[in-house]
């Protein structure tokens, strides 16, 4: 008999009662090679014939089972065929189908093309929907049977359905395939969710607890599929997290003016990467704040820390609250953190002793005000702290000294009021404004107000108002002597305040983002061109120091001939710009014997007698001038600086003179610090009793900086946390040695560690140290140091466990942090670096080649192109094609290029025939990437990994899990889903 079609062949086999293997042999004779059985829909044809009657045809079913066992038909074709059966009233047919599914549902596989693997995902999704519908139908029948008094048939079928459902869903591989299918077919997943809800309603009335709990387990497994990548266990066995501690210390010490959002994101990044529970995370923030308060040097730094702790950190926590689901849960976590903090009585007592008050109470009040604590918890915590507090502290508190926390909290609303006052028209009541400014200068008011403004993000606005005021006072027309003196004072106070702000908080705070065409204010011009700063070398012969000669001559005459400075009609900005050239004339006259020392004293008294800003401008030029002089030529210039730095003992000075001189001396001391160290000179500035430059000149003399670096890191590692002083030393070393030197030497120290607990601590500390300039350090680490270690076989031994694991962890943390933040603004402490030692990454990885560099592409292609996937879309896939290219990520960005090249190197290592510690390192690196991911790799560093790396990675035993494959592929792309499906289906 000549067979015409598949249906006839099946019927002939049934009529002639062929055995299953005989059927298979004959089928292969009837249908010669060419079309596959799946294309001919063999599974569907067999099921259709087997399910014609009220009960299934056992012989035809045996053919199907044989076809499944001998892989004549694919799993996906069988699942698709089963899901088309919808007459659930035929018990025996349903049971037969469940038996067939039971044969292979926990060991699905597909070794074909990527499209076939995606087909398996879709078929499994259809089968899951069918199982849910079948379970719901069985449950309804059971209910009807219970009402009729015949529950047995329905109960048996429901048990079989749930058993098959649980077996299918228990496999992580199946759930991973369903995860991909959900992304491929969102509408089908919605149908599954509806079926699950319907099933839940039906089973709610079920009396059998065993079946109900089994159904609940299945429901939980289905609901977990969309979020199967976001489950991370938190570190409950640890109580100290040095990275958070160091990050807070770094921000409080060096970046008070920084925006809050980048800090919030960085803290959340660390919390996620290190899996820190929220209460311990908040506790670590508070601990670091109290340590900062205790160890901060007296004066401005102490006020900065107080503002950081009491004004900025509560606001940071308010922003952090938005990242957590459930506001109530977060307030409970904050309460829990305070409960832990109250157990650290010695720390809190020491802080109270330092600040002369109950520090915790002030903090609790502020958190309560910000809605971070409930009233009940607030009252309970205050009561506990009052009971635990050392009674001697209360008695030793000095009632005459107002504590800094209280002063800072009161200063914050004052800042707002001053900003409003400064908005008024200055010409209407200059005397009233002068009164406000004069009050600001007294005692430590100015530093308090500046710290409060810095911590609340108002300092830039504050500085802008003073620049506008300074600009307003540069000209005077038709003024009386009184008006002229008020104008001179307003100019002087605003100038001194702005200099003080620039030196204390960085010149970035002062600079405006002025659009082209706008006139740059006088103070900004002077600060950028004439003001000495750390790391800024000024040319004393620069045109900015050489103004109009007629103005200079008239100023020299005024200084030399007048008994005191004139005020009326004085253009103070011109005087400030002319003073440098005037000083040069006066110096030359002195050195050539034209002027005697008494005349110089009279001139310097004139310069500083009315407005201190003239003295500041004069010293600014003298500092630049002294740098250029030989050892024997400096004496007179330094003597002139000494003359200008001393106060003037005269009754004929303008208002607030003593207060202005204090600020002037602080400014001059900062200006002269570098040049005095370089010239080994001492100038005694009038002391205020407080070290105005506590973190300056910390490096020990005559010691190689590499020794200093290794020593400081060893001490930090031994202690387990970074203190403020160490942060400043490390920052100086980073400035001095450059990023490559700094990063390379610290990585060498890490690779020397052999104790596991020490390497983990070292990584946590190094990450926080690298935050001094995370972007540049990451470029060096991923672009130079890691490739050097991975490609040089003589260095592979250093990548053994534990230091290798630690380095992989550190590299991933740095990469993730830099990648997540590099689209935002660099922090103020990173922007002010002037560096020539970083290579230009665009020239390192040439930009004309929009793919990653040629060298890396050569490395990544293997001899036998085994990486190339076999479907039509796969064949066209370049071995370096990655999700980042499909997302059209900007490859001109240095970090993107470095990441792309690193992942190509990783791909080549995995595809090479040589295994070693470097291969193990790559595995640890990828494991850490997966461990740190939130939901999927879209937009993370893994988008730079070539798609072909996935098939290489699953060959590594530790990485051959469905969850890992889902994590490392970009499932938002169809190609990413195909790659993931192919890799998972082959596991």
UniProtKB/Swiss-Prot annotation:
Cross-referenced InterPro entries: Mediator_Med24
Record organism: Mus musculus
Cleaved signal peptide residues: none
Residue positions of motif LXXLL motif 6: 855-859
Family to which the UniProt record says this protein belongs: Belongs to the Mediator complex subunit 24 family.
Complex formation: Component of the Mediator complex, which is composed of MED1, MED4, MED6, MED7, MED8, MED9, MED10, MED11, MED12, MED13, MED13L, MED14, MED15, MED16, MED17, MED18, MED19, MED20, MED21, MED22, MED23, MED24, MED25, MED26, MED27, MED29, MED30, MED31, CCNC, CDK8 and CDC2L6/CDK11. The MED12, MED13, CCNC and CDK8 subunits form a distinct module termed the CDK8 module. Mediator containing the CDK8 module is less active than Mediator lacking this module in supporting transcriptional activation.
GO MF term (any one): transcription coactivator activity
The protein's name: Mediator of RNA polymerase II transcription subunit 24
Position of sequence motif LXXLL motif 2: 344-348
Motif window: LXXLL motif 1: 128-132
Motif (LXXLL motif 4): 555-559
Annotated motif LXXLL motif 5, positions: 786-790
Renumbered ranges of motif LXXLL motif 3: 446-450
Name of one Pfam family that matches: Med24_N
Compartments (UniProt record): Nucleus
UniProt modified residues of type Phosphoserine: 860, 871
Distribution of this protein across tissues and organs: Expressed in the adrenal gland, brain, epididymis, heart, kidney, liver, ovary, pancreas, prostate, skeletal muscle, small intestine, spleen, stomach, testis and thymus.
One Gene Ontology cellular component annotation held by this UniProt entry: mediator complex
Role, per record: Component of the Mediator complex, a coactivator involved in the regulated transcription of nearly all RNA polymerase II-dependent genes. Mediator functions as a bridge to convey information from gene-specific regulatory proteins to the basal RNA polymerase II transcription machinery. Mediator is recruited to promoters by direct interactions with regulatory proteins and serves as a scaffold for the assembly of a functional preinitiation complex with RNA polymerase II and the general transcription factors. Required for basal and activator-dependent transcription.
């Amino acid at each position: 008999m000549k067979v015409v079609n598949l249906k006839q062949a099946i019927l002939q086999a049934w009529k002639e009662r062929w055995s299953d293997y005989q059927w298979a042999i004959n089928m292969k004779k009837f249908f010669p090679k060419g079309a596959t059985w799946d294309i001919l829909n063999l599974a569907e044809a067999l099921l259709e014939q087997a399910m014609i009657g009220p009960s299934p045809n056992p012989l035809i079913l045996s053919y199907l089972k044989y076809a499944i066992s001998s892989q004549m038909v694919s799993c996906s074709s069988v699942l698709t065929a089963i899901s088309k059966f919808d007459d659930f009233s035929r018990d025996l047919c349903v049971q037969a189908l469940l038996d067939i599914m039971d044969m292979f549902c926990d060991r699905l596989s597909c070794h074909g093309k990527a499209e076939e693997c995606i087909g398996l995902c879709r078929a499994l999704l259809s089968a899951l929907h069918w199982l849910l519908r079948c379970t719901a139908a069985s449950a309804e029948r059971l209910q009807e049977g219970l009402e009729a008094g015949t529950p047995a048939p329905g109960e048996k079928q429901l048990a079989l359905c749930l058993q098959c459902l649980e077996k299918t869903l228990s496999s992580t591989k199946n759930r991973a395939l369903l995860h991909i299918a959900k992304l491929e077919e969102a509408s089908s997943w919605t149908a599954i969710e509806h079926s699950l809800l319907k099933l839940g309603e039906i089973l709610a009335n079920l009396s059998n607890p065993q079946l109900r709990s089994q159904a609940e387990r299945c429901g939980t497994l289905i609901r977990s599929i969309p979020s199967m990548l976001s489950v991370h266990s938190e570190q409950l066995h640890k109580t100290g997290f040095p990275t958070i501690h160091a990050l807070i210390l770094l921000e409080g010490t060096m970046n008070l003016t920084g925006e809050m959002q980048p800090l919030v994101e960085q803290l959340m990044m660390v919390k996620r990467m290190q899996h820190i529970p929220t209460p311990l995370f908040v506790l670590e923030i508070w601990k670091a704040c109290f340590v900062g308060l205790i160890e901060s040097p007296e004066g401005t730094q102490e006020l900065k820390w107080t503002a950081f702790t009491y004004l900025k950190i509560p606001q940071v926590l308010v922003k952090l609250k938005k990242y957590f689901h459930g506001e109530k849960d977060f307030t409970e976590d904050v309460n829990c953190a305070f409960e832990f903090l109250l157990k650290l009585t010695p720390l809190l007592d020491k802080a109270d002793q330092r600040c002369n008050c109950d520090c915790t109470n002030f903090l609790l009040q502020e958190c309560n005000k910000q809605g971070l604590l409930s009233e009940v918890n607030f009252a309970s915590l205050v009561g506990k702290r009052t009971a635990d507090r050392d009674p001697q502290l209360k008695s030793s508190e000095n009632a005459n000294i107002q504590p800094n926390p209280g002063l800072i909290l009161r200063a914050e609303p004052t800042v707002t009021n001053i900003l409003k006052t400064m908005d008024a028209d200055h010409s209407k009541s200059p005397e009233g404004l002068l009164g406000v400014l004069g009050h600001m200068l007294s005692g430590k008011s100015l530093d308090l107000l500046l710290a409060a403004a810095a911590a609340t993000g108002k300092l830039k606005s504050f500085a802008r108002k003073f620049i506008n005021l300074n600009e307003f006072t540069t000209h005077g027309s038709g003024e009386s002597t009184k008006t002229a003196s008020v104008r001179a004072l307003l100019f002087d106070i605003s100038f001194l305040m702005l200099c003080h702000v620039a030196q204390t908080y960085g010149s970035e705070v002062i600079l405006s983002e002025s659009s082209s065409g706008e006139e740059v204010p006088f103070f900004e011009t002077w600060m950028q061109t004439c003001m000495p700063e750390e790391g800024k070398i000024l040319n004393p012969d620069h045109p900015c120091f050489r103004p109009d000669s007629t103005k200079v001559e008239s100023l020299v005459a005024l200084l030399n001939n007048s008994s005191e400075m004139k005020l009326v009609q004085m253009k103070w900005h011109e005087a400030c710009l002319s003073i440098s050239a005037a000083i040069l004339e006066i110096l030359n006259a002195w050195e050539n014997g034209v002027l005697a020392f008494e005349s110089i004293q009279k001139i310097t008294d004139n310069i500083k007698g009315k407005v201190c800003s003239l003295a500041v401008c004069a010293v600014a030029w003298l500092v630049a001038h002294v740098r250029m002089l030989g050892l024997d030529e400096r004496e007179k210039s330094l003597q002139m600086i000494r003359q200008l730095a001393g106060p003037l003992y005269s009754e004929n000075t303008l208002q607030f003179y003593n207060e202005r001189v204090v600020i002037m001396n602080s400014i001059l001391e900062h200006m002269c610090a570098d040049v005095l160290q370089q010239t080994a000179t001492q100038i005694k500035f009038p002391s205020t009793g407080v070290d105005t430059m506590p973190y300056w000149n910390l490096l020990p003399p005559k010691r190689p900086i590499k020794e200093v670096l290794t020593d400081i890191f060893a001490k930090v590692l031994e202690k387990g946390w970074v203190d403020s002083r160490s942060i400043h030393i490390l920052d100086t070393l980073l400035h001095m040695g450059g990023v490559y030197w700094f990063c390379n030497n610290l990585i060498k120290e890490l690779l020397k560690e052999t104790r596991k607990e020490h390497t983990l601590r070292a990584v946590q500390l190094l990450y926080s140290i690298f935050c001094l300039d995370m972007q540049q350090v990451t470029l060096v680490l991923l672009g130079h140091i890691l490739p050097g270690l991975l490609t040089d076989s003589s260095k592979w031994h250093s990548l053994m466990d534990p230091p290798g694991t630690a380095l992989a962890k550190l590299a991933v943390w740095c990469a993730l942090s830099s990648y997540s933040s590099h689209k935002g603004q660099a922090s103020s402490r990173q922007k002010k670096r002037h560096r020539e030692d970083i290579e230009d990454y665009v020239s390192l990885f040439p930009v004309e080649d929009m793919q990653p560099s040629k060298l890396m592409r050569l490395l990544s292609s293997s001899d036998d192109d085994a990486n190339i996937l076999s479907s039509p879309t796969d064949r066209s896939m370049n071995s370096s094609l990655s999700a980042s290219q499909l997302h059209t990520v900007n490859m001109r960005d240095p970090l993107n290029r470095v990441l792309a090249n690193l992942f190509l190197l990783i791909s080549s290592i995995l595809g090479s025939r040589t295994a070693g510690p470097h291969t193990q390192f790559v595995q640890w690196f990828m494991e850490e990437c997966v461990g740190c991911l939130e939901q999927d790799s879209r937009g993370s560093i893994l988008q730079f990994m070539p798609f072909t790396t996935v098939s290489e990675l699953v060959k590594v035993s530790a990485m051959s899990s469905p969850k890992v494959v889902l994590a490392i592929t970009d499932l938002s792309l169809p190609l990413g889903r195909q790659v993931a499906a192919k890799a998972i289906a082959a596991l």
